[in-house]
Amino acid sequence: ANVILKGRTLDESQSFVKEKIKEEGLTLIHPYDNHNVILGQGTIGIEFLESIPDLDCLIIPIGGGGLISGIAIAAKSINPKIKIYGIQTKKFPAMYNLLKNKQLNITGDTIADGIAVKIPGEITGSIIRNYVDDIILVNEFEIEKAISSLFENDRVVSEGAGAVGVAAIMKSPDLFQGLNTGTVICGGNIDAR
């Protein structure tokens, strides 16, 4: 395999990929708007509920929506009463805008660059509309606090996109009070500021 790193955002990278596909006749496996990718990511939902069968809710980052789509389908298939909350950064609320018919600005850089997606998926948008209970937006300061808390309290190094679930819990503790809650914490792809 030939790995090429190109672009600061997913959108910039996708523009480069489209050019390469035209030039070289390559096949695109979409990173989130693909049924097989969503199906694979659903195994995380199964693992959550096999490990902790009495979960009341899951809090999942949203970029293009593949991860939360797979997890939501799997989790609600096992436990239809489980609540699924999606988390986006206030700087990139693309899926939030789509589902809530809002026009919040999508702009700037974010510490949660792993979920900095300007255009949500069509397949994922439909799934999220049917399976996700709500989307919570978190700001940069809230994400930074979550990253710090994860490191200081648990010695977990998480990138911004991986810490947004914890940011949502810290932002809205009353929403999750008394609930068995799970979140995905991932990625050590973070630079010191």
Model-identified regions with their sequence ranges:
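PLP-dependent amino-acid enzyme catalytic core
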Residues: 1-193
